[in-house]
Every structure is written in structure tokens, then in C-alpha cells.
Amino acid sequence: MISRTDIEPILEAIPAARQEYARHYGVHPYFTRRPANVVRAYLERFSEEGDVVLDPFGGTGVTAIEAFLLGRRAIQNDLNPFANFIARNIADTTLPSTAPLRQAFERVEQ
């Protein structure tokens, strides 16, 4: 776990690299989407493998998917059902296997 004294701010600009992530994030032009490489840089700086990342305003899941790809666990939600639909479908086609996650989610839903 990263302690408060270990946190160093990101001082350099992180240019958005939208093109290299088009395969899984170019599915739909959602209005609040953030560049995945910028989200990834923050996750790498401010979390460690195995940490839980919470994104309560998850949109189409960029933060959650990048967290999973970096070995973090993630919780994401959005008020917009369309955003959740997009996030679920991107996760289903991007992540190796979401079956255990989906089963856990369905148990929590019940």
C-alpha cells in the first residue's frame, strides 16, 4: 500500500494517446471518456498491484478496465445505464475473462 508520504505528484504533462487504445475504447464516442494512457499513468503512480480502485462515476469503464489490465481490482458504477452497458461490453471483449467478476456482481445484486 502506498502511504501519504510516498505520493509524488505527476508534474509533467501526459499527452493523450487516443489512437493506440482505439481497439477497445473506440467502440462508442461517450462524452466524458478520458484518454486511457492518462488514466493508466495515474493508476501506475497512485496504486499498486492488488489494490482496489473505486470509480463511482465510471462512465464507460476506462478506469476500471485499465485497473484490471494493471493487476488492480476495480469497482465501477455510473448512473447512466447506457454507460454501464458500454462498460460491460467493452470489458467482456477486452479482459481475459469476466465470468467470475460477473458472477460475483450478480450475487451482490441479489
Describe the residue ranges of each PLM region:
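S-adenosyl-L-methionine-dependent nucleic acid methyltransferase catalytic domains
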Residues: 1-110
